From Swiss-Prot:
Record text on subunit structure and interactions: Homodimer. Heterotetramer of two MnmE and two MnmG subunits.
Binding site for FAD: G14, A15, G16, H17, A18, G19
Binding site for NAD(+): 292-306
Cellular location(s): Cytoplasm
Species, as recorded: Opitutus terrae (strain DSM 11246 / JCM 15787 / PB90-1)
Name this polypeptide is given: tRNA uridine 5-carboxymethylaminomethyl modification enzyme MnmG
Alphabetical keyword list: Cytoplasm, FAD, Flavoprotein, NAD, tRNA processing
GO cellular component: cytosol
């Protein structure tokens, strides 16, 4: 049965963090959008830890907000603890993080989706895609209903042939309590998309009243919280009643009545239990084939890979105001349940803990992201976009950032418009996508500030300034907000010029600020500016030398970054190009010389050969009239 007589502009398959941002972004730029999910009651569920942000991830969330996404606002409104990480270090590596009320976060997102114009929700499990040659035109569902669309965004998370492990026990599913998407993998493979297996895991959940917090160290939120959204949600009554368990009208404004997290450590007994039972672990017992995340290791990995460490830090994180459930951050495991009980009880403060949910590992299919264009469209299937964990990433924030870009580009593809592509110097989202597409990943990819070579320019406070032209060009923000950002940008640049030019007997005001490390007395007019303006002005003045050096480096890189490679180039017929490089370039088909230079195995000499051929117009062409990635031949 066909659901719609006229095709949707965009169909999004999956309503996790990538799917939500994809569907909202597409709808907000005016595309008639359908969001399909197997269960409308789990839209936006925080499957693992109840937190948003953290190192580099906080910057991604602010970039999502700067581009009109929802994650930042949703976090501010449903957050129950806010902290600025690395606050004693420079602004380039400072990152906001928040604990969220898990259910409130989910419910508010669903409510936002329901109210969004141009967006329709429907509960059905996607079982396969519908193709017309090398182009996707819709999808099939378990209800025997077919949905047709101009573009399709697949955001399946851990559900593609998801298999959960607790010791030797196995159950199909992408998350405890939910089924897996079993047949969609076959549909993708039939279209020529390669799939591999990754693994992730989650720790047990505990009953709060069974914990002894007197044996743990308290971790409070910041007295002056750093929020994620640039627009202060408190100004327009940004409250959401569901999470608070109070009568309507008594909801808690963002940042107020914050809750605490708690810290404890593993013991020698914990280590002994892990080592004694390694063979019963699904991971170490050979039950799991997929590669797990390096930067979020299981407790088994911690005691094997870091055997010299006598103990490991654990965080007890509350899952909400209206629940007594706690998440044990750092205790992910695939050990059997009887061992899990002993592990938990070996930890200070958890000796009498009651387990509400077991820890488990989940194995799932992902598509190596080198099969994508920078727009996140498949090279093989026209109109098919992939975002989130299907691209090999881990984390809500990485998924949401990809989802927003995929949603915008799916809408733009349907209109015949150029895609939105963020540069590495413009956004962490740009670094993320460029890394995935040009380098690929052999393990679940997590973003860090160290991955961004231009991180000095990517501080969390500047996101809406550096992405203003993209937000404006894509019509992702309303006119009032765009005007406000433009005025803020002008004010910052004006104040930087003034401080660099106004002189006193001790030098310019900027020189005095740099000499006194921001302790200098600032002009009263500047002090009357908003804190975000003051902070950005001081940051640019204090680090002006580094800032200018970065800009010069970016300008130099732009000389090759902007050079487009002909779509029909035949790398295997280029004289002097090493065969290893030719094969990798032919497989990934980068759009620009800059992308080509970042592909593993391609060296500067290879790039120089390409540069000369492109500039002289002597690049050999493929014999066919179209490239293998579906791009039209110029």
């Amino acid at each position: 049965m066909r659901f719609n007589s006229e095709p949707f502009d965009v169909i999004v398959c999956g309503a996790g963090h990538a799917g939500i941002e994809a569907s909202l972004a597409a709808a907000r730029v005016g595309a008639f959008t359908l969001l399909l999910t197997g269960n409308l009651d789990t839209v936006g569920q925080m499957s693992c830890n109840p937190a948003i942000g953290g190192q580099a991830k906080g910057q991604i969330v602010r970039e999502i907000d700067a581009l009109g996404g929802e994650m930042a606002i949703n976090t501010d409104v449903t957050g129950i603890q806010f902290r600025l990480l690395n606050h004693t270090k420079g602004p380039a590596v400072q990152s906001p993080r928040a604990q969220c009320d898990k259910k409130a976060y989910q419910f508010r997102l669903k409510h936002t989706l329901e109210l969004q114009p141009h967006l329709q929700l429907f509960q059905a499990t996607v079982t396969g895609l519908i193709f017309d040659g090398a182009k996707v035109i819709g999808c099939r569902t378990n209800l025997d209903i077919e949905f047709y669309g101009r573009t399709v965004v697949v955001t399946t998370g851990t559900f593609l042939r998801g298999l959960m492990h607790i010791g030797s026990n196995k159950n199909e599913g992408g998350r405890l309590g939910d089924f897996s998407a079993r047949t969609l993998s076959g549909s993708l493979q039939e279209a020529g998309i390669e799939l591999r297996r990754f693994k992730t895991g989650t720790p047990p959940r505990l009953l709060g009243r069974s914990l002894d917090f007197s044996k743990m160290e308290e971790q409070k939120g910041d007295a002056n919280p750093t929020f994620f959204a640039f627009h202060d949600t408190r100004e327009d009554g940004g409250v959401f009643h569901v999470e608070h368990g109070k009568p309507q009208g008594e909801a808690i404004p963002p940042g107020c009545e914050q809750v605490s997290c708690w810290m404890t450590y593993t013991t020698a007994r914990t280590a002994e239990l892990v080592r004694e039972n390694l063979s019963r672990s699904a991971m170490y017992g050979g039950e799991i084939e997929g590669v797990g995340p390096r930067y979020c290791p299981s407790i088994e990995d911690k005691f094997v890979r870091f055997a010299d460490k006598p103990r490991h830090l654990l965080f007890l994180e509350p899952e909400g105001r209206g629940t007594d459930e706690f998440y044990v951050n750092g205790l992910s495991t695939s050990l059997p349940f009887d061992v899990q009980l002993e592990l938990v009880h070996s930890i200070p403060g958890l000796g009498e803990a009651v387990l509400l949910r077991p820890a488990y590992a989940v194995e799932y299919d992902y598509a190596p992201p080198t099969q994508l264009k920078m727009s996140l469209e498949s090279q093989r299937v026209e109109g098919l976009f992939l975002a989130g964990q299907i691209n090999g990433t881990s984390g809500y924030e990485e998924a949401a950032g990809q989802g927003l870009i995929a949603g915008v580009n799916a809408a733009r593809k349907g209109r015949g418009e150029q895609p939105l592509v963020l540069g590495r110097h413009e956004a962490y989202i740009g670094v993320l996508i460029d890394d995935l597409v040009t380098k690929g990943t052999e393990e679940p990819y997590r973003m860090f500030t160290s991955r961004a070579e231009h991180r000095l320019l990517l501080n969390h406070g500047s996101a809406e300034l550096r992405l203003l032209h993209h937000a404006s060009g894509c019509k992702l923000l309303n006119v009032n907000r765009l005007d406000n950002i433009a005025r803020k940008k002008e004010a910052i640049e004006s104040w930087v010029r003034r401080l660099e030019s106004e002189r006193t007997s001790e030098g310019t005001l900027a020189e005095i600020i740099r000499r006194q490390n921001a302790r200098a007395e600032l002009p009263s007019e500047l002090m009357r500016q908003s804190k975000p303006v003051r902070d950005e002005v001081l940051y640019r003045v204090l680090y002006s030398g580094y800032w200018e050096r970065e800009q010069r480096h970016i300008d130099k890189l732009a000389q090759i970054e902007a050079v487009r490679i002909p779509a029909a180039i035949d790398y295997l017929r280029i004289p002097g190009l090493r065969r290893e490089s030719a094969l990798k370039l032919a497989a990934q088909r980068p759009d620009t010389l800059g992308q080509a230079s970042r592909i593993s195995g391609v060296n500067p000499a290879d790039v120089s050969i390409l540069m000369v051929l492109i500039k002289t117009g002597k690049t050999p062409s493929l014999p066919d009239t179209a490239t293998t990635d579906g791009r039209d031949v110029p």
